[in-house]
UniProtKB/Swiss-Prot annotation:
<dbReference type="Pfam" id="PF00679">
    <property type="entry name" value="EFG_C"/>
</dbReference>
<dbReference type="InterPro" id="IPR035647">
    <property type="entry name" value="EFG_III/V"/>
</dbReference>
<dbReference type="GO" id="GO:0032790">
    <property type="term" value="P:ribosome disassembly"/>
</dbReference>
<dbReference type="InterPro" id="IPR027417">
    <property type="entry name" value="P-loop_NTPase"/>
</dbReference>
<feature type="binding site">
    <location>
        <begin position="88"/>
        <end position="92"/>
    </location>
    <ligand>
        <name>GTP</name>
    </ligand>
</feature>
<dbReference type="InterPro" id="IPR005517">
    <property type="entry name" value="Transl_elong_EFG/EF2_IV"/>
</dbReference>
<keyword id="KW-0547">Nucleotide-binding</keyword>
<dbReference type="InterPro" id="IPR000795">
    <property type="entry name" value="T_Tr_GTP-bd_dom"/>
</dbReference>
<dbReference type="InterPro" id="IPR009000">
    <property type="entry name" value="Transl_B-barrel_sf"/>
</dbReference>
<dbReference type="InterPro" id="IPR035649">
    <property type="entry name" value="EFG_V"/>
</dbReference>
<dbReference type="Pfam" id="PF03764">
    <property type="entry name" value="EFG_IV"/>
</dbReference>
<feature type="binding site">
    <location>
        <begin position="17"/>
        <end position="24"/>
    </location>
    <ligand>
        <name>GTP</name>
    </ligand>
</feature>
<protein>
    <recommendedName>
        <fullName>Elongation factor G 2</fullName>
    </recommendedName>
</protein>
<keyword id="KW-0251">Elongation factor</keyword>
<keyword id="KW-0342">GTP-binding</keyword>
<keyword id="KW-0648">Protein biosynthesis</keyword>
<dbReference type="InterPro" id="IPR031157">
    <property type="entry name" value="G_TR_CS"/>
</dbReference>
Amino acid sequence: MTRRTPIELYRNIGISAHIDAGKTTTTERILFYTGITHKLGEVHEGAAVMDWMEQEQERGITITSAATTAFWRGMAGNYPEHRINIIDTPGHVDFTIEVERSMRVLDGACMVYDSVGGVQPQSETVWRQANKYRVPRIAFVNKMDRIGADFLRVQRQIVERLKGDAVPVQLPIGAEDNFQGVVDLVKMKAILWDEASQGVSFKYEDVPAPMLELANQWRDKLVEKAAEANEVLLEKYLSGEALSEEEIKTGLRQRTIANEIVPMLCGSAFKNKGVQAMLDAVLDYLPSPLDVPAIKGHDEHDKEIERRPSDKDPFSALAFKIMTDPFVGQLVFFRAYSGVVKSGDSVLNPLKNKKERLGRILQMHANERKEINEVYAGDIAAAVGLKDVTTGDTLTDPGHVIILERMIFPEPVISQAVEPKTKADQEKMSLALNRLAQEDPSFRVRTDEESGQTIISGMGELHLEILVDRMKREFNVEATVGKPQVAYRETIRKKVEGVEGKFVKQSGGRGQYGHAVITVEPQAAGKGFEFIDAIKGGVIPREFIPAVERGIVDTLNTGVLAGYPVVDVKVTLTFGSYHDVDSNENAFRMAGSMAFKEGLRRATPVLLEPMMQVEVETPEDFTGNVMGDLSSRRGMVQGMEDIAGGGGKLVRAEVPLAEMFGYSTSLRSLTQGRATYSMEFKHYAEAPRQVAEQVIAARTGSTRA
């Protein structure tokens, strides 16, 4: 079977937005117009095709990035058939990890904004992630039929808050109830969609006379932005010649792909207006796999190599999502960067050094699937039969190995104890939790050594709530959940040298002997743990040095203050001694552990707590109450700004997570239910002495801090 679509006609895009900006409805309309779904799924009826997990339908928020393939020839049918692979990404802060992992495999993104709310806190998070992976983007201002809709206000917010060069390629005709269609600034024509056909048919008309002046102003700006793409266009523009439609589009495309501008469009997905033109903009301005840099990685000898998006290059792909499907078992979603792979082929997972056979290959449409025989460079598909693959692993041709850069996932900030309700649930629960942890790298499961309880950790209360809910629905496990606990950390503040750990045991015949001397010092925040071997003259034999490191690593999980994991510490092994007969790995492991514990005690240990970036949108009357309440929670208010359109105030603050439990309830009572807030993890900071003493006392019964 040969490739159906040439690679230059591929678009791998994400649809990304703040919760409630109408992203799922927008995706639904895309599926409808591209001819896949016949009845439009409305989110508020709980019927959207992309939101295919039960909890998503109940909560009306999108949790899992479902990948969908659609074909598009332009709304006037005047383009060659393009293949659009769409990754639907969640908009809730607790699922930022989902957005992050889909950004990694996209070539372009469509950012959806609410015409009234504009740039909201989550929009900023998503924008930062898109910047991190240098993803070119277009913006779609949705819900133009809402009261208070203002397209140009959103344009200003993108420029001021996100520092993006937002370039309108359309202007809305009317707004709120009077929203009729858009002015296409490239063609300088009005586009009006026919409501009877649910927006499938449309007509071009002249720009309405009252809008001509505004349209000409914005068109001049648009043409200037396009002309700056290259010298040929710039010269033509400066000499006063008019640029053709094609030249304007070429210039805008070049600058969008270079991440210099963000073309802006508008519409109302719910009213079937504007989504079709937004799809045309995806073809016009967002990159194909050929327009983005070749993917880089390392071979097995750590030499940097790259793979071009060509069917002729050896096969390479990145597994970006694992899902458990009730019918086919584990599904691995992957993005093929180069080469071709067929079902039945063997691929290598170089990180685990395991060869695996690709069973069936499926092309996904929300939660429906079509079996295909092969996958070409640039495509996104799901494979059945890969047992040991986790998110972020590379899949490669066994004869031409490449290891692509791994994804980095944030550490969880919140934990809960979870217990099965019955003995029968016990086994099912550990299976369910392991499955869920395999799917979601920001979710961790461990057993507390002292209490024997199972502890689950994640990125927020909603994150854990949904995972427990899934355990009940998908695995029939009834569980009781404890109160959320903060994931504290420990670190040190000073350097100590010459710390000794000596493990000596005489028992009858053969004894045990291990002796290590270390230097322990703090590292910059986020640097993690580092071990340096500075042994000279063989005072500790080579074969025992890894054992010393292992002993230290074992101890990292339980700090000396309250037993929390230790972070950002550097340990240098400087000296030691051994015994010809009695020394062994275990003895040196114990010596390493003893030295490290002693080093931590002497190096001024401190407790770290997670700090959250909190943003509250509140009516002006309640601003004082909200700020006072945040301060009482040990929050540092960092600023306040007006919400455009007289919509109250946006208060930004940094607050310890420990003080934020139950915040939504108290915010409701403070503001009569009229304020909303969002919260995301910012960084770890040293806990004040009084707080540290309370935490330590609760864990250990003593208050040493």
